[in-house]
Amino acid sequence: MSTIAKDQTQINDKIRAKELRLIGQDGEQIGVKSKREALEMAERVDLDLVVVAPNAKPPVARIMDYGKFKFEQQKKEKEMKKKQKIINVKEIRLSPTIEEHDFQTKLKNGRKFLTKGDKCKVSIRFRGRAITHKEIGQRVLEKYADECKDIATVEQKPKMDGRQMFIMLAPTAEK
């Protein structure tokens, strides 16, 4: 959602429109009023006149306490930020001729990343003539994905990128 900058919010005398669709402090529709009439109504109840929908024809303004409105908006923004989850992509590098113990160590590290909620990019770099045996690398990647299938799903199947083959694993959604 876009945040409203302080200088972009039209309140009281900063309202540019001549006519406004007015909403009262309780949320009831008052109707289309001139800017002067709307300001007088807001001053009578000692509140502010705030444009809430500037793109509407005519713009929609509401009689409210602007300080309270701004505070509520900031509170909602903070709540939305809390709910956002930052997903990192961690990379595990393997070799097509990896030994079993090394494979298990790399697997343990990858599982740790996945349980934390991070995505995992498992890549194999082919050096020299090893590029002629891509199927060996593909088997290693498929074995890695198979070992992690209880906590992760394959987001991207094994794919070549230059001299590298990689697979993307994403943690399974918790229920």
Curated annotation (Swiss-Prot):
Protein family: Belongs to the IF-3 family.
Name recorded for this polypeptide: Translation initiation factor IF-3
Gene Ontology biological-process entries: ribosome disassembly
Subunit structure: Monomer.
Keywords: Cytoplasm, Initiation factor, Protein biosynthesis
Broad class of where this protein is predominantly found: cytoplasm
Annotated localization: Cytoplasm
Any Gene Ontology CC annotation: membrane
Organism classification: Bacteria, Bacillati, Bacillota, Bacilli, Bacillales
InterPro entries attached to this UniProt entry: T_IF-3_C_sf (IPR036788), T_IF-3_N_sf (IPR036787), Translation_initiation_fac3_CS (IPR019813), Translation_initiation_fac_3 (IPR001288), Translation_initiation_fac_3_C (IPR019815), Translation_initiation_fac_3_N (IPR019814)
